[in-house]
UniProtKB/Swiss-Prot annotation:
Catalytic function, reaction form: Hydrolysis of the 6-sulfate groups of the N-acetyl-D-glucosamine 6-sulfate units of heparan sulfate and keratan sulfate
One GO term describing the cellular component: azurophil granule
PTM: The conversion to 3-oxoalanine (also known as C-formylglycine, FGly), of a serine or cysteine residue in prokaryotes and of a cysteine residue in eukaryotes, is critical for catalytic activity.
EC top class named in words: hydrolase
InterPro entries to which the protein is assigned, alphabetical: Alkaline_phosphatase_core_sf, GlcNAc_6-SO4ase, Sulfatase_CS, Sulfatase_N
Superkingdom of source: Eukaryota
Its biological purpose: Hydrolyzes 6-sulfate groups in N-acetyl-d-glucosaminide units of heparin sulfate and keratan sulfate.
Residues with PTM 3-oxoalanine (Cys): 83
GO MF annotation terms: glycosaminoglycan binding; metal ion binding; N-acetylglucosamine-6-sulfatase activity; sulfate binding; sulfuric ester hydrolase activity
GO biological process entries: glycosaminoglycan metabolic process; heparan sulfate proteoglycan catabolic process; keratan sulfate proteoglycan catabolic process
Protein name: N-acetylglucosamine-6-sulfatase
Designated gene of the protein: Gns
Binding of Ca(2+), residues: 47-48, 83, 318-319
Length: 544
């Protein structure tokens, strides 16, 4: 039975971009239409999978089939440590200040009508389909508010997808609803037919069986794992019984020299809190075993059909995660390595096996890379990211960036939580013991610098303290000591300047390796005044 297409009764019929929207894109791939053996692309995206705390450990088959067959990036970051802003960055190739998705709510532009009108027509899948002639397939979690009645419901199919099997709202494993090319299909709690990771695997295998062989394809498969509620498949629910969350140097300690939200965490954590996060850690790993199976099934199918050697496979996550670091129980959202660093593994034609790249990359680079593979002229986009293709192909004369931007706008309202009256107003994502993971003014921007000379992180907060955090990651990989008050003021000024440049960049100016303005003079007093910097005010009040 042929899979139904998102285009309607005629399978494979492309949904065209509106003519006016298509005009700026024309010319990119047209020269490649009809070219032999254009590569296929498979993008596998997990939900909340860290790189710092052993997130790849359970995925032995994935590491063997993708990482060992290609390249593993050891310095891959997300521009925002939260699902919807990060996923929007993958799709658009833009930093959050340019796509304006700031959190997981409709009000924060997550799958809102504004997002659908302004950003979706220019995502890289839209270009792949309407300009480059690719068959495009999506299955799994899209954006956290996808399917909301106020934003088109499940009938909405974003431009750019030939086959659309999207999850309503946030990650679940059972009792969910899928949009099957715009029509709702409910699932229950029968493992054999409803377990979402396996459902996504089966939909993907069906697509590979029934797709057209005359056009290249792009597949994006977005699993619920290892996001809460961490429901493992029955056969894996006893796995990792002796595993606990890593007790690294920043586990269960007080964030003494950090911004106020981290300082409010209670140290030491209670025994019940530690038992809870250890259980969560184990269950997260258990859910990833089904992802490992999914990867194996897809690679085997591509191999059996003779398409593996012409297919690029990307494996990554939308953000990292923490389990007890600085006494924060479990979540993401924070600026530290455990939340912003993610796995990134790539295999494909021309990529030598068993490589590790230390180059500084971001998920805004995925879209430009995939368009580059398809032959599209990246100069015709307004994407902020850079193509990874020169790195993947081993270009020895490559000039690359030394800085990437991380930015986040806190969730919550400036009111007191009645269940935690002793805390400051505006906290959110609070646990029963009133340890909170977010707040309305947990708004920050960071520049992550990695070069032959420096391995630093510099962050500014838009709060009453106008707090600054700086870390030497080489000397302090667990980010225990904030050196903002002791670092050389000249270096501090350079980092501040780099941050301002990145927060004001757009398109080509984001892709230019950082060069300092020799005329720039830094005034330390401006950083710690009570009014906030021009940069932070602009970010927090940027219109959607």
């Amino acid at each position: 039975m042929r899979l139904p297409s998102a285009a309607g009764p005629r399978p494979g019929r492309p949904r065209r971009l509106p003519a006016l929207l298509l005009l700026p894109l024309l010319g990119g791939c047209l020269g490649l239409v009809g070219a032999a053996r254009r590569p296929n692309v498979l993008l596998l995206l997990t939900d909340d999978q860290d790189a710092e705390l052993g997130g790849m450990t359970p995925l032995k088959k994935t590491k063997a089939l993708i990482g060992e067959k290609g390249m593993t990036f050891s310095s891959a970051y997300v521009p925002s440590a939260l699902c919807c802003p990060s996923r929007a960055s993958i799709l658009t190739g833009k930093y959050p200040h340019n796509h304006h998705v700031v959190n997981n709510t409709l009000e924060g532009n997550c799958s809102s009508k504004a997002w659908q009108k302004i950003q979706e027509p220019y995502t890289f899948p839209a270009i792949l389909k309407s300009v480059c002639g690719y068959q495009t397939f999506f299955a799994g979690k899209y954006l956290n508010e996808y399917g909301a009645p106020d934003a088109g419901g499940l009938e909405h199919i974003p431009l750019g997808w030939s086959y659309w099997y999207a999850l309503e709202k946030n990650s679940k494993y059972y009792n969910y609803t899928l949009s099957i090319n715009g029509k709702a299909r409910k699932h229950g709690e029968n493992y054999s037919v409803d377990y979402l990771t396996d459902v996504l695997a089966n939909l993907s295998l069906d697509f590979l069986d029934y797709k057209s062989n005359s056009e290249p394809f792009f597949m994006m498969i977005s699993t619920p794992a290892p996001h809460s509620p961490w429901t493992a498949a029955p056969q894996y629910q006893k796995a990792f019984q002796n595993v606990i969350a890593p007790r690294n140097k920043n586990f269960n300690i007080h964030g003494t020299n950090k911004h106020w939200l981290i300082r409010q965490a209670k140290t030491p954590m209670t025994n019940s809190s530690i038992r809870f996060l250890d259980d969560a850690f184990r269950r997260r790993w258990q859910t990833l075993l089904s992802v490992d199976d999914l990867v194996e099934k897809l690679v085997k199918r591509l191999d059996s059909t003779g398409e593996l050697d012409n297919t690029y496979i990307f494996y990554t996550s939308d953000n990292g995660y923490h389990t007890g670091q600085f006494s924060l129980p479990i979540d993401k959202r924070q600026l530290y390595e455990f939340d912003i660093k993610v796995p990134l593994l790539v295999r494909g034609p021309g990529i030598k096996p068993n490589q590790t790249s230390k180059m500084l990359v971001s998920n805004i680079d995925l879209g430009p890379t995939i368009l580059d593979l398809a032959g599209y002229d990246l100069n015709k986009t307004q994407m902020d990211g850079m193509s990874l293709l020169p790195i993947l192909k081993g270009d020895r004369n490559l000039t690359w960036r030394s800085d990437v931007l991380v930015e986040y706008q806190g969730e919550g309202r400036n009111v007191t939580d009645p269940t935690c009256p002793s805390l400051s107003p505006g906290v959110s994502q609070c646990f029963p013991d009133c340890v909170c993971e977010d707040a309305y003014n947990n708004t920050y921007a960071c520049v992550r610098t990695l070069s032959s000379l420096w391995n630093l992180q510099y962050c500014e907060f838009d709060d009453q303290e106008v707090f600054v955090e700086v870390y030497n990651i080489t000397a302090d990989p667990d980010q225990i000591t904030n050196i903002a008050k002791s670092i050389d003021p000249e270096l501090l000024g350079k980092m501040n300047y780099r941050l301002m440049m990145l927060q004001s960049c757009s398109g080509p100016t984001c892709r230019t390796p950082g060069v300092f303005d020799p005329g720039y003079r830094f005034d330390l007093r401006l950083m710690f005044n009570s009014h906030g910097s021009v940069r932070t005010r602009r970010f927090s009040k940027h219109p959607l």
